[in-house]
Amino acid sequence: MAHYPTRLKTRKTYSWVGRPLLDRKLHYQTYREMCVKTEGCSTEIHIQIGQFVLIEGDDDENPYVAKLLELFEDDSDPPPKKRARVQWFVRFCEVPACKRHLLGRKPGAQEIFWYDYPACDSNINAETIIGLVRVIPLAPKDVVPTNLKNEKTLFVKLSWNEKKFRPLSSELFAELNKPQESAAKCQKPVRAKSKSAESPSWTPAEHVAKRIESRHSASKSRQTPTHPLTPRARKRLELGNLGNPQMSQQTSCASLDSPGRIKRKVAFSEITSPSKRSQPDKLQTLSPALKAPEKTRETGLSYTEDDKKASPEHRIILRTRIAASKTIDIREERTLTPISGGQRSSVVPSVILKPENIKKRDAKEAKAQNEATSTPHRIRRKSSVLTMNRIRQQLRFLGNSKSDQEEKEILPAAEISDSSSDEEEASTPPLPRRAPRTVSRNLRSSLKSSLHTLTKVPKKSLKPRTPRCAAPQIRSRSLAAQEPASVLEEARLRLHVSAVPESLPCREQEFQDIYNFVESKLLDHTGGCMYISGVPGTGKTATVHEVIRCLQQAAQANDVPPFQYIEVNGMKLTEPHQVYVQILQKLTGQKATANHAAELLAKQFCTRGSPQETTVLLVDELDLLWTHKQDIMYNLFDWPTHKEARLVVLAIANTMDLPERIMMNRVSSRLGLTRMCFQPYTYSQLQQILRSRLKHLKAFEDDAIQLVARKVAALSGDARRCLDICRRATEICEFSQQKPDSPGLVTIAHSMEAVDEMFSSSYITAIKNSSVLEQSFLRAILAEFRRSGLEEATFQQIYSQHVALCRMEGLPYPTMSETMAVCSHLGSCRLLLVEPSRNDLLLRVRLNVSQDDVLYALKDE
């Protein structure tokens, strides 16, 4: 078997920390801490009781998650072993595929579930522990964070008890919070830790929220073109970020003026929508943060006496970047210093905002203003409202609790009436523009991780329309199925082989034996194998399906432990080794090659400590899985022998002595002695099966059912053949010419005709229905074979015999061309084997059926 290249695993050394405590009742030593050292690395991990750990499992990418409850050393065997007792968590991929719909939503990528199932094995090998993991419990109303890069942070919100998902109880929620708080205290620091992990100032929820914000701010800054920021935007963003003193120190160096002028703090953020940046003179309302005098004093903005004497409305207009009226004299000089070329500070000529300067620059900016304001103001405000609606949807999607407050601060002037906005727009002259400069990419990258910015609304994902992306599915019925129009049509539906009957008659004992075998394995949490044999059509597969259906109902009623059912059929496989692929895909949903799937299944059923439920595997048509090495049969029968497998195999084949006839000794020994043979149905059993199918339906005469049952029981005892004959009899009865007063029941004549069609050869039927000239040509072939003593003759010899037979019977003999056409037609029906017609008279002719069958078909009735 070819092996795939696997990842090189580092060797780890496990040792106890501290003195042991002797448990006199269980006679082993317990510990409170364990040290894990990795070969070739100077770091070490200290694991204590109560922490959450990762444990080796079947999938290296998704190891098992558990809470460490106890550490002890088992010295019952000569080499002492390090053992641990844990409380398991389960991932969504570990939940059975048939029960994943019970969650009712899409699970988070890093969401796990508390495994509330006491019957699982919680005693594991302590040397299978990989490392520590952080588990954060969430309340039922909390949203599981998504798209987090920290793989060692998991979230638990619900519990899973093999039947349904439940929210965490208050006691369990408090218990999960306790070790989370003490984990940082009891865990010793490791050199490889980063500064962010060591800082105790952030709570887990705030840490996750900051990472989400930094990612969205980074994506937004890459998509947004660089534009100079207006004083209004600077003041507003500056006031919005007063709570972060570190941010103020970083951004205060970005805009420096001369010593005589005022220093201003600038915080760059892409809060405004693209439509607002393209139209800087748009009317805006003052945010609540700008109206607070306390926050205004913290920003370091100083006003002159004229500004203090001015009314609040004028001060609002000054801060919100709306042009001042001509009667106000603004004498204070303010320096606008956009960052350019990677420099952290730059000095530019100051611009004095006075009415005279505004008048001079008004003419220069008129053309640019007309181009920028080509869209009506009312339409621009509607587009900004749409943008804000998209931002609100994105904030709800991220689950940010502060979204409502931030929306109020950046809400545009949507509540102002149309008339008042038009009047203000007509009375306010445009303010001067700044030439755009390139903002430093390095500075922007340093700031984008700490600023909270709003992200663009992701586009709706379109459904794939190309055939290569479309998922294959069975066509759905556009119209409802029509109900049977007659009694015979209803009988045909009930007699179909695939129709599921209400009961399974004549197999009560076999049903009980198989049910008891599987039920005992489920209750004992062990594995086993049963070999079921019998001729085709004796109800082997139907009986097993009925057993599984009853066990599934019992599992739902808590009578037996839950299990997973898998069925494979050797008839549906293109190659015997594909059985590994089918089992792995139905068990875990993974897709792999045959060799890789065999390795994964062997690891699944032979690894200790894996918290899995019992698997019932039905292998139908087992004889088709035979190979020269018989490795497939050996693996299927060897896996249930392992204690940790919890695998029950039900193998079905048509041969009773298959293990002794074709299996090796090592394979037949793994199969065991639990075998069951299904005997062919007798006449009375077949008659009972037919009557149970036609219950409360009068479509057959009693003698017609008895005739079919006796005929089939004498030949094979196949129930499927019996059902097919009865269905054909209903078709013959329906299409036969009957009198108007006939009862319309299937009689003995109809059943006899159906039996003859079923058991007679198709070649004989074709010869009986052939023309007189074709039957005469077949007689000529038999006469020539009898004359020459060979079973092959040329067309010329057969034509001579054909002419002689026609003269003896007084019939006009056909021409050579007509006889050649008859020979070609019989050859196309595969009654004859003929050479190509280019040989003409010398082409050789043979019979494709026996001479006795031809004589039987040509005899006079």
From Swiss-Prot:
Residue positions, PTM Phosphoserine: S199, S252, S255, S273, S287, S340, S417, S420, S478
Modified residues (N6-acetyllysine): K326
Compositional bias ranges of the Basic and acidic residues kind: 207-216
Main location: nucleus
Recorded name of the encoding gene: ORC1
Keywords tagged on the record: Acetylation, ATP-binding, Disease variant, DNA replication, DNA-binding, Dwarfism, Magnesium, Metal-binding, Nucleotide-binding, Nucleus, Phosphoprotein
Assembly: Component of ORC, a complex composed of at least 6 subunits: ORC1, ORC2, ORC3, ORC4, ORC5 and ORC6. ORC is regulated in a cell-cycle dependent manner. It is sequentially assembled at the exit from anaphase of mitosis and disassembled as cells enter S phase. Interacts with CDC6 and KAT7/HBO1. Interacts with LRWD1 predominantly during the G1 phase and with less affinity during mitosis, when phosphorylated.
Lineage of the organism: Eukaryota, Metazoa, Chordata, Craniata, Vertebrata
Protein name: Origin recognition complex subunit 1
Listed CDD domains: BAH_Orc1p_animal (cd04719), Cdc6_C (cd08768)
UniProt PTM: Phosphorylated during mitosis.
Organism, as annotated: Homo sapiens
Compositional bias of kind Polar residues: 270-287
GO cellular component terms attached to this protein's record: chromosome, telomeric region; cytosol; nuclear origin of replication recognition complex; nucleoplasm; nucleus; origin recognition complex
Low complexity: bias regions: 440-456
Binding site for ATP: V500, G534, V535, P536, G537, T538, G539, K540, T541, A542, E621, N654, R720
